[in-house]
């Protein structure tokens, strides 16, 4: 029985392979469609460095020290910078904020608002590696996500990222408002 099953499986695989090879022409993309599939929109190092510098200048004006991570849409580090005085957790959270933007395709502050009063959702996001704390913003050009910026270490992380994006790339969508914490019922 096992021998017959193995032979049948091999024959099916062989038949599928030759059948698929005969139809390969149906799946070939050429001309303009091919150019579109090969073109990759991703933030370049030069722009990432400009964003970082603008963020560092903002931090200095506000007497803060920050860490900045710029990631590609696939999560690869394009540029990172740590100002003096940063502790390891600030460095880690800056990268986590940028990654969270890529996972959710939204600002990390928007995720913070979403989970503000929902412990169950906080736990689910955490299990997925999403860090719902403000300071991460998408980098969007012509409606296309080309990367993410994450800033950690200061009390104005999101403002730092936003200021950098508007000064280097241009006008950005408005930042989401903060969600106030749920009212705690008075003890009885």
Predicted regions and their residues:
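N-terminal secretory signal peptides that target proteins for export/translocation
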Residues: 1-2
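Bacterial N-terminal signal peptides
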Residues: 6-16
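Flexible, solvent-exposed loop/hinge segments and secondary-structure transition points
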Residues: 22-188
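Sec/Tat signal peptide C-region and signal peptidase I cleavage site
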Residues: 17-21
């Amino acid at each position: 029985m096992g021998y017959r099953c193995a032979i049948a499986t091999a024959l099916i695989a062989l038949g599928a392979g030759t059948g698929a090879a005969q139809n390969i022409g149906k799946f070939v993309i050429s001309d303009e469609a091919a150019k579109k599939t090969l073109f990759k929109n991703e933030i370049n190092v030069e722009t990432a460095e400009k964003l970082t510098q603008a963020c560092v200048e903002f931090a200095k004006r506000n007497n803060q020290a920050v860490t900045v991570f710029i990631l590609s849409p696939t999560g690869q580090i394009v540029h990172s910078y740590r100002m003096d005085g940063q502790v390891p957790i600030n460095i880690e959270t800056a990268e986590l904020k940028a990654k969270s933007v890529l996972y959710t395709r939204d600002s990390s502050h928007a995720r913070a608002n979403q989970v503000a009063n929902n412990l169950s959702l906080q736990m689910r996001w955490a299990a997925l590696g999403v860090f719902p704390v403000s300071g991460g913003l998408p980098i969007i050009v012509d409606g296309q996500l080309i990367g993410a910026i994450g800033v950690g270490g200061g009390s104005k992380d999101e403002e730092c990222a936003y200021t950098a994006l508007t000064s280097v790339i241009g006008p950005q969508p408005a930042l989401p408002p903060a969600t106030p914490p749920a009212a705690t019922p008075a003890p009885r």
